Amino acid sequence: MPKVMKIGKYQKRRRKRAGLPILLILLLIVAFGSLAYSVVLGKQMVDSGLIAETSSEKDVDNVISDIELTPSEPASSSQQAPEFGVPLPESKRVMGTYFDDAVFFGDSVTDGISLYDVMSNAKVISHTGINPGTALTSKVIKTSDGEKITMIDALKEANPKKIYIMIGINSIAMDKDTFLSSYSKMLDTIMEQHPDAIIYIQPITPITAAFEQSSKNTYKITNERISEFNEGILALAGEKQVYFVNINEVLADETGALPDDASPKDGIHFGAKYYEKWFEYLKTHTAPV
């Protein structure tokens, strides 16, 4: 009688072996499904802004390049370097105390500051008939002990923080180039002695039309010639990088002359009203801090 094979146990073993691949396949499907879900979820979170997208190396390079090529914002007007060689523009008005540490250095026109007591807190070093050359050499300033010293030495002793210069009306008859050379030397000396001071140059003030035509005008001074000298002074201000304060904006009329009523006596020197105009202009034309 043939041997009958018992298949019950065999079939059970086959079913066990067949179940392993199916289990692996199911696990792989679950794993890939989870991965796909993570990718989709991650993209949704990036799109919604919940997380930041990771940049590639190329993207980072592009960002750096963009930063390097983007121009910086311009500095504010208060931070910009001052422009020299042009008249100082209007600025915020300062108080009279601004001139506490200032010296006004000049000729007979500057003398009027003391004469009319316009700015009593400011120191004045001036002399009638002075010019840029004699300001360095002529001993015309009397000290407290009676000794006489030059204007430039008096300025050195005063050691001001601000210096306002006005010299030139007595030099109009000179050769212009000679005058400017002398003026340049005077400026160099002042700047060397006072390296930290704010230096303001003021133009030669105009004369009246009446005096321009007067027989008393022995040196044939004209406002046109004064203007030519002032252009040279302005150029020096640019070269030396000091400030030019164009006070003639408030002293001259529409023709460029000093109004006749401003100087009825001699056509050159003016009265207290015009000194007040002068100083009001200075208060609104100061160097940036």
Residue ranges: model-predicted function:
Residues 92-181:
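Conserved SGNH/GDSL esterase-like catalytic core that processes O-acyl groups on lipids
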Residues 183-187, 230:
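Generic structural signal for well-ordered alpha-helices
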